[in-house]
Amino acid sequence: LIRSSIAIGLAVFLVGQSSSEDASKKLAVDESTFRCLTEMEKTELGAYFVDNVLGNIDATLAIANSADGGEFPAGSVISLVPSEVMIKHQTGWNEATADWEFFELNVSSEGSTIVSRGTTEVVNQFGGNCFGCHTQARPEWDLICGSDHGCAPLPITRETIVNIQNGDPRCVNKASDA
């Protein structure tokens, strides 16, 4: 009974925190924010792609490529696969998620459509809660999962991830327009 009460209390606390968004710290994000992966910067290890909606790509890349981790700057955009994206809002936007917002997208040659966005409630195409997984990352990784960052392994292989990345339909449309 005590364990259940603690679990329920923690869940209520987290849900309460997920709603603690400071609108003045929120970045403007809409469907046009999300670009073809090849228009973003690939990290040195090639594991994921980054961008920065505020133009601070050098600082975002420095943290993404750091062997020691660090805190990503506001505006950072992180994407492992085309349909899953994290965006870092201004400091103080949402303490529970270290100012990250999670997005599940539908992507096509026409662009991106936001299916779901939020803090602790977004679920990906595999049925996993984005925040639930990313919160397992050790503090120095700023909620970014990697093979040695403390997160549970993904249910798909690296080869499958690369195939999904290479198949971003938004990029195919750009290539055929050229």
Residue locations for each model-derived region?
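Sequence context surrounding c-type heme c attachment/ligation sites in exported
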Residues: D22-L45, G69-A178
